[in-house]
Amino acid sequence: MTSELTIDSNMLAWEQSKWPGIRRRQLRLDAETGGRTVLLKFEPGALLPRHMHPGGEELFVLDGRVRIEGKWYETGWYRYQPPKSVDDVFTGTGATILVMLPKPHVDLT
């Protein structure tokens, strides 16, 4: 994507993902690379199963608390994962995270 994109994410509906308790708002999708930026909203007890990041991943916790590979990340935490890294994401209390993916890997629909 080579042009500017501005979105009021509050105007987007939360869509149910294929995983129970996880909804999403897709902010950006690059049709050429498959890269995307997505908001994920986790209900208490939700789990995003183990998956690989072929192109890496950037993640920012907007609210709540998530456990990734045994480590807890709370509101305001940022995490970068290099290409080919593997993880799962769990929350006991609920959370909203911003995920930026340079390449497609896990189907977030």
Where are these regions (language model features)?
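Residue-level marker of beta-strand positions
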Residues: 47, 77-78, 96
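Conserved hydrophobic/aromatic beta-strand scaffold that supports enzyme active sites
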Residues: 24-26, 37-39, 58, 78-80
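Short histidine-centered beta-strand/loop micro-motifs
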Residues: 38-40, 49-53, 70-71, 89-91
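Short, charged/polar surface micro-motifs in flexible loops or helix N-caps
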Residues: 32-34, 44-46, 105
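Ligand-binding loop in jelly-roll beta-barrel domains
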Residues: 22, 83-108
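A short, N-terminal "cap"/entry segment at the start of jelly-roll beta-barrel domains
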Residues: 1-34
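Glycine- and acidic-residue-biased ligand/ion/polar-headgroup-sensing regions
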Residues: 44, 53-68, 75
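Short acidic-glycine-tyrosine-enriched beta hairpin
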Residues: 68-88
